């Protein structure tokens, strides 16, 4: 959320995750090992669980920006791009909710965000009752998966939503070097 900071709440959430990661890796060597190791420790998994919750909150904050036609269109499109990057892939689906009642449908994240950009009127979203339903556990693909549940205020859809969370290795470039590091992503929102 460097480009689209949402104030003290996001800064506090980032600080909590940074502190949890710092406790898990007090030295530079340990920090490097934390992100490149083949398995994660309990403390590291706890830190990534906190980061997953932050990413979900960030997604909801992005939705409020995207759904505000009073904001600059380019700014809203950048917010949509950043929101999409929180997911495992652009093909992730979202149970589309809006400010109006009706049966929500499953749509791709990109279609959902584009519909919000086209929406008439301002919508404001916030998370209520965020819970960890399934803590992060190692799967057969050498990734960690878990599940969060939450309710969203600002919508007519009062159902409990669920999203999968995955912590997987991704290739990142650090100057001239590349390395595989752990990163957390959201999956489909149902």
Show which residues each predicted segment covers.
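C-terminal tail/extension regions appended to the core domain(s) of diverse proteins
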Residues: 9-10, 135-139, 173
């Amino acid at each position: 959320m460097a480009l689209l900071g949402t104030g003290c709440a996001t800064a506090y959430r980032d600080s909590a995750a940074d502190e949890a990661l710092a406790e898990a890796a007090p030295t530079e060597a340990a920090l490097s090992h934390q992100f490149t190791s083949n398995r994660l420790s309990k403390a590291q998994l706890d830190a990534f669980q906190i980061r997953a919750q932050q990413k979900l909150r960030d997604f909801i904050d992005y939705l409020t920006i995207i759904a505000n036609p009073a904001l600059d269109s380019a700014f809203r499109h950048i917010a949509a791009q950043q929101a999409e990057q929180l997911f495992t892939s652009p093909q992730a689906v979202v149970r589309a909710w809006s400010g109006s009642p009706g049966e929500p449908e499953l749509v791709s994240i990109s279609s959902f965000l584009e519909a919000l950009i086209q929406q008439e009127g301002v919508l404001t979203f916030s998370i209520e009752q965020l819970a960890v339903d399934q803590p992060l556990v190692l799967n057969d693909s050498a990734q960690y998966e878990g599940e969060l549940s939450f309710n969203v205020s600002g919508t007519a859809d009062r159902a409990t939503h669920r999203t999968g969370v995955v912590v997987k290795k991704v290739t990142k470039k650090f100057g001239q070097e590349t390395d595989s590091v752990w990163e957390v992503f959201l999956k489909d929102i149902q």
